[in-house]
Every structure is written in C-alpha cells, then in structure tokens.
C-alpha cells in the first residue's frame, strides 16, 4: 500500500511540473511569462486592440469594472501633465487601472501565461500597458525600491526578470511601508532603464511609482539577509528579445509562437489529468 509520504511527494512533484516552478516564488527568467514587446506591429495592434478589449470585457467582468472606474479617474487627471507623441486615452486608462485592484490577477495571468494561454483575458490591457511604458520611458536609468511580503529565492546563477509588470517606488520609505512590506519578505533595490515614472497616471500619487515591464532582464543579482527579510539588488538591466512578439496581431510569427504555446498547454493539461488519476488510484488502493 502506498504510504502517505509517497502520496504527498508524488502530488508535490506533479504539481511542480504543471506550474513550472521548482520552488515557490523563485526569482528566475520566468519562462512561462507572456513577454510580448510588440516590436514591428504597433500600428496593427492600435487597430486591433479596441476589439480585443471588448472581447476581454465579455470574458472578464473584473477587468471591465476596473477599466470603467479608471476611465473616470483618467478624465479627471489627464490634463495634469504633458505626454509624448502617440500616447492616448487608452494608455492612460490602462495605467490608472493597473494602480487599482486589477494588477494582482493581471500579473498572475501574465507570469503563468504558457500554462493556459487560452484563458488570458488581458490581451488589450497588456498591450496598452506595455506600449504606455515604452512611450513614457525616457531611456534614463534610475534606482527604485520594491517591497513585498513574499520571500523570494535565487539560485545564485543566471540573469533574472520579473515576468510581469512590477511596481516600485522612487521612495524607499514607501516601498518598506505597509501594506507592501511587513519586514519579513523581500526588499528589492533595482536599477531600471525601462521602467516609467507613472505618478501622474495613478490613483496614489504619493507612492512615486515606477512601473517596470516584465521583459526587462537584470544580469547582476546580489542577495543578502537583513534582519528578518531578504534584500535583493538587481543591476545591469538589459532589454532582450522576448519569447513572444506580436502574438495577437495575426502575424505569421505570432502563429508560430501560438502553436508552441498550445503544445505546452496540452502537456500541462495532461499532467493535471495524470495527477488526478494517480491520486484517485492511490486513494482507492487504501484498505
């Protein structure tokens, strides 16, 4: 008869294969992330994104409600600063919405995109956010701080990226304050060259937020234990080619990547089914 320890190990191992995370909250290159930079298809996406947004609204009620709230806020604040050429209301609304309540579900779906690409109902939102950061980024580098109640781990080898949009602040005291940081999680000290200062596009201007795109790669990583928390310094930022590009624009390249994503999704589905069957059989085998 299989022991409870064996059942636990089997369940744990298969779960790790499905999620693609060997260790929870591992700091790595986020291999499952949707990291589209929309290089070469901005014009196409500008035409297609409004339709994609409506499709996402039909499938994602939370996004629809948060977007409608953000539209109202954006109309109130959009004349408080000047914006670069090409920046429009969709970009501003997306940034405001992100600083609300939708960022958690968006980031979870973005980081684990390859596991279930067919259930990603943030297509236009991701595009507008990404494009907004590209337009607002002045190509200058800045040091920022990101506090989280999660304890991250790093293997000590290789470059890393967040794999999702990452909020940070120019003000260390903001990053280390509640509710962002409880003193037992992780404090990131980041040098970002692709992050954009979005203070004037936020519900919370006092946070001095700098939003970092998930595709920014950091080649120098230093970790240390400080009192009860982990401090991680990320430096030597670079912009590298993404695994996805123009995924929703309908281009040939997008179709090729889509096929890859579908194959990986099938493998994940198979492992989920296998997990359920094995656990069921082990349970039935007990006297």
Curated annotation (Swiss-Prot):
Marked site positions, Required for the thiol-dependency of NADase activity = 80, 201
Which residues are processed away as propeptide to yield the mature protein?
259-287
Q: Which residues are glycosylated?
A: 171, 256
Localization, UniProt: Cell membrane
The answer on whether this UniProt entry bears the keyword rRNA processing reads no
Q: Which PANTHER family match?
A: ADP-RIBOSYLTRANSFERASE (PTHR10339), T-CELL ECTO-ADP-RIBOSYLTRANSFERASE 1-RELATED (PTHR10339:SF24)
Functional summary from the UniProt entry: Has both ADP-ribosyltransferase activity and thiol-dependent NAD(+) glycohydrolase activity.
Q: What is this protein called in UniProt?
A: T-cell ecto-ADP-ribosyltransferase 1
The record lists the organism as: Mus musculus
Q: Which gene encodes it?
A: Art2a
